[in-house]
Amino acid sequence: MDTRFWGPSGWRLLHLIATAPPRRQTRAFFELLPYVLPCKYCRSSLADYYAVDAVPSTNFAPWLYRIHNRVNGKLRDQKLLKTPNPPWSTVKAEYEALFKAPCTRNAMIGWDFLYSVVYTTPCKAVPSEPLPDAPPSETLTTPELRNRWNTMEREERIQFIGRWWDLLPQVLPYASWRTAFASGPKRPSLTEGHKAVTEWLFQVEQRVCRALHVAANHTSFGGLCRKLSVFQSKCGSKKTRKTKTCRSSVAKGDIGKVKQTRRKSAFFNST
C-alpha cells in the first residue's frame, strides 16, 4: 500500500497509543509492528531500527519519537521528505495536548492505516518475494531474519498479524475506543483472505462510530474497496535496491485529497 496513504494515519494513532498511560499489552503490540506494516520495505527497515533501539518495557513515547526520526531520515535520503524533525519537547507537548483534548476521544483515528493492514493480509496466490540481496534461505533461521528479508511463508506471517489484531483493542488510548472496538464482530481467520478481513474491519468501524456518536468515514464497503485499490502499490516489484518505499502510481489529485487534512509537521506528514 502507498505509504503516503497510510503513513500519517498510522503515525498519529501509534504516537497517541505511546503517549497514553501504558497498558500491560502495549510492549507486545509494538514488538509485533515490524511483522504487520503494509509495505515490505517498511517492515524490513523497522526490523533494522528495532535491532538498535528495542521496544522498552515502559515510557514508549520518546522511544517511538526516536524510531520515527529514523524513518524520516530514510525518507530524506530518498529525497521523499524535506521537513526537519521537530524537537522532542514539541512532539511531546503536541501529543500530550492531543491526548487530553476532549474532542480527540470522541472519534477514533487511524482507520486508513488499519485498513491498509487488512487489505495487505497475505494471500495464498501471492508468495513473498525476497528483498534484493537476501541471504540464502537456510541461513534465515529466526522469524526476525525471515521478516527482515521478506521470506516468511504466509502461514507464519499471519500468526504474527493475528496476534497484533488481538492486542489492538486492548492498547487503544481511550476506554471508549477499547470498549467499542471489542464489541464489534469477531475477526475472521486471516486464512480467509484480505476481503473477508477488510469487510470485518468495515463492520467494526461502523460499530465504533455508532458507539462514539460520530459519522463513519466510509459508508459503503464497495466504496471503501475502490478507495483502497487506488492506493494499492506493487511495493517495489522491480529488483533494485533503489526502491525502498512502497508507492503507487496514484494520481496526484488523489494524494492531494489525502494530504488536505494533515498538519505541516514531520510528525504528522511523514510516511
Where would I find each of the regions flagged by the language model?
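Mid-to-C-terminal functional-domain signal that highlights helix-capping/loop sites
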Residues: 1-36, 40-271
